[in-house]
């Protein structure tokens, strides 16, 4: 066995070979893709729409710009960005999972969003775009599933234009202890049951909960973005820190 194959990472609370995580995460999202939007509404009581709306407002995206919606899944952010950039702008919806990408493409086309959106199956760690290419990159509820987060952040930095910005919307660490206890009880006991009823897959939503707990907290992620080269990194807690929006610039 090579040294590289012995390198491990987390898959929820499990420790797995780095080479295996991508395949394991892919199975999760293949399983949940068809009910992904419904489950988001049920799990968050619809609040995910508020979090995403705030992200759009914080992005500063304008007409004629080029935006990368990374781990864009079913295209919620892409749909909004498409309107903001206009017919001469461009939005690239990228996702490593072909099932999610297919759902996003079908959903946006059903809504008549076709002219300025393209679709790319891509690994966040090795983005297939030129240097200094995008005005803005967003990654929404996707970074925690990436095997090598530091490498992915460096890849995002590379493809951003000078003056461009990265926004990372992700589950984080609640800042109030009572909220944290309620959140834990809901996440570990109720979410998997919802997943079992709606998707017939409790394990995928158990992984979701565990992956959130293993994700870097607010200050740690801020430091990782700075190490990747981003300047003026800041974050905003939402819903008591259950979710945080990190923002950084490339100068």
Curated annotation (Swiss-Prot):
Species of provenance: Proteus mirabilis (strain HI4320)
Annotated protein name in UniProt: Ubiquinone/menaquinone biosynthesis C-methyltransferase UbiE
Catalytic activity field: a 2-demethylmenaquinol + S-adenosyl-L-methionine = a menaquinol + S-adenosyl-L-homocysteine + H(+); a 2-methoxy-6-(all-trans-polyprenyl)benzene-1,4-diol + S-adenosyl-L-methionine = a 5-methoxy-2-methyl-3-(all-trans-polyprenyl)benzene-1,4-diol + S-adenosyl-L-homocysteine + H(+)
Domain of life: Bacteria
EC number, UniProt record: 2.1.1.163, 2.1.1.201
Keyword entries, A-Z: Menaquinone biosynthesis, Methyltransferase, S-adenosyl-L-methionine, Transferase, Ubiquinone biosynthesis
Gene Ontology biological process: aerobic respiration; menaquinone biosynthetic process; methylation
Positions of S-adenosyl-L-methionine binding: 74, 95, 123-124, 140
Pathway(s) per entry: Quinol/quinone metabolism; menaquinone biosynthesis; menaquinol from 1,4-dihydroxy-2-naphthoate: step 2/2; Cofactor biosynthesis; ubiquinone biosynthesis
Gene Ontology molecular functions: 2-methoxy-6-polyprenyl-1,4-benzoquinol methyltransferase activity; demethylmenaquinone methyltransferase activity
One Pfam family this sequence matches: Ubie_methyltran
Gene: ubiE
């Amino acid at each position: 066995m090579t040294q590289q194959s012995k390198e491990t990472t987390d898959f929820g609370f499990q420790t797995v070979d780095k080479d295996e995580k991508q395949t394991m995460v892919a199975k999760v999202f293949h399983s949940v893709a068809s009910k992904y939007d419904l489950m988001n509404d049920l799990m968050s009581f619809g609040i995910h729409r508020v979090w995403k709306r705030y992200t759009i407002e914080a992005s500063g995206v304008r007409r004629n710009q080029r935006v990368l919606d990374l781990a864009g899944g079913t295209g919620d952010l892409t749909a909004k960005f498409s309107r903001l950039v206009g017919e001469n702008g461009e939005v690239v919806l990228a996702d490593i999972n072909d099932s999610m990408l297919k759902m996003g493409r079908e959903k946006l086309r059903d809504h008549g969003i076709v002219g300025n959106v393209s679709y790319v199956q891509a690994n966040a760690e090795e983005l297939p775009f030129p240097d200094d290419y995008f005005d803005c990159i967003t990654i929404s509820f996707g970074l925690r599933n990436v095997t090598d987060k530091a490498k992915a952040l460096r890849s995002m930095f590379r493809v951003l234009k000078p003056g461009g910005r990265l926004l990372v919307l992700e589950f984080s660490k609640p800042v109030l202890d009572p909220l944290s206890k309620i959140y834990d009880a809901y996440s570990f006991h109720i979410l998997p049951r919802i997943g079992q009823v709606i998707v017939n897959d409790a394990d995928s939503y158990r992984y979701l909960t565990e992956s959130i707990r293993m994700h870097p907290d607010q200050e740690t992620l801020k430091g990782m973005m700075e190490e990747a080269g981003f300047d003026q990194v800041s974050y905003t807690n939402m819903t008591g820190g259950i979710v945080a929006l990190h923002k950084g610039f490339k100068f």
